[in-house]
Amino acid sequence: MKTSRRRFLALSALGLAAATRPSVSQAQNLPKPPQPARLRLSCQEGVAPGKTLTEKLDFLEAHGFEGIEPWGGGLPGRVEEFQKALRGRKIRISAVCAGFEGVLISEQEEVRQKAIRSIKEILTAAGALGAVGLIVVPAFHGQTKLGHVDGRELLVKLLPELGEHAHKAGTRILLEPLNRRETWFLRQLADAAAICRDVNHPGVAVMGDFWHMTWEEPSDFAAFVAAGSYLQHVHIASRKERKMPGEDEGDNYVDGMRGLKFIGYQNFISFECGSKGDPRQSIPAAVRLLREQWAAA
């Protein structure tokens, strides 16, 4: 019996779907994380209301936050300030947000070396403060002339040195994928995880950002599962305008939270966003929303 190419492809697709679709018994036997995931909220220092660091910490603690995320620029000179401010509190440094000089995958050696020196200085401070890691974007639009292949090759070459410095300091490099309007390089969590796999160093990890993921990831769940154990930090914002979670219509994070629960995520979800209203009202409202959605995930 003759089979047309169209029929052959259709039958093949049906067979593949049947073969790859998990049965009920298979679904019940999916591996469970070594420990249940926790919802630990953090907020960037610049997002939290308050005129002083103490006022910001007081506000965050009063609303159930466990972490604060400072900017990396100037952090080496603020280590003692943070140590004193955090003494006797339950809140801690979650991660450190960038703030380094130079461009890590610049085509210019002197620009790369400037980035390496600056990143190491901030990593030392991040480690002293017990931060999960330092967020690193390899390059934004217009910061490098290297193509994707050369840029990736260079990044994989440079990261072991930075990862070793981070590991000795007690922290990590956190590679952050961005959306296509901000960079052409490194836009999905799976790509960042693949770089971590190739580098194979405990000092090199990944972070995800719900805002960037809105534009780049087909599935929040799949993105977090793909990142797996490499995922060590998460940013969150409203999904249309990058404001407080809940300030945009349809802000929903349940799919991603299911992914975080699936991998047993233990670290922070940190607010990196603006606010349409008074943050003293919008932040508590966002916290309530996230706790509700976490429970539903």
Name these PLM-found stretches.
Residues 41, 93, 173:
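Hydrophobic anchor at the start of a short beta-strand
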Residues 2-42, 51-61, 131-132, 186-208, ...:
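Histidine-acidic metal/acid-base catalytic patches
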Residues 42-43, 99-100, 180, 239-240:
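Residue-level signal for pocket-adjacent positions within structured domains
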Residues 63, 89, 169:
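Conserved dinucleotide-binding and phosphotransfer motif residues
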